[in-house]
Amino acid sequence: FIIAALVEELIKFGTVRLYVFNKPEFDEVTDGIVYTVAASLGFAVLENLMYSFGPTTVLLIRGVTAVPLHAIASGIMGYFIGLSKTRRCRSAAPGIILAVLIHGFYNFFLFISTYTAILVIPLLVISWRVLRSLIRKAQLFDGAST
């Protein structure tokens, strides 16, 4: 569960790092969140296309939960990418670790049994609240830098 999450989150991290991290437009903490969420949504579309060839129920569950999961976990990672870009934090590693843990728990809850799948809902709600808090912090950092 963790290996798949690690690979997927590193793909999204690598995409942002490779394509937008060094752009002059990436100059605020919030930019890290925005660019990483955008990368995650593109990833989620491609992943769901792969699942579209399987059972309809899997596609429906993934369509409702996987897209928010990717956006939320990557948004949290993006906050730390933004911090590292603006020199407020040495490394984006804490964000990568958090994203992998959230994603790993998501995978675990969904794949272990139908009974544990319900735990995806509180995981997404709690993670969403964390992301909202980080967005507010990012806006404060960005407001202080202008």
What are these regions (language model features)?
Residues F1-V7, I11-N22, L119, L123-I126, ...:
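Specific transmembrane helices
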Residues T65-A138:
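Functionally important transmembrane alpha-helices
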Residues V7, I11, V16, V20, ...:
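Membrane-water interface at transmembrane helix exits
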Residues S52-I61, F108-T114:
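Membrane-interface helix caps and helix-loop-helix hairpins in membrane proteins
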Residues L10-A39, F53-T57, K85-R90:
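Membrane-interface helix/loop boundary segments of multi-pass membrane proteins
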Residues F1-V7, V58-L69:
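Short aromatic-rich membrane-water interface segments that cap or initiate transmembrane helices
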Residues A4, K12, D31-Y51, I96-G104:
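Small-polar-interrupted transmembrane alpha-helices in polytopic inner-membrane proteins
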Residues R136-T146:
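Short, highly charged, low-complexity non-transmembrane loops/tails of multi-pass membrane proteins
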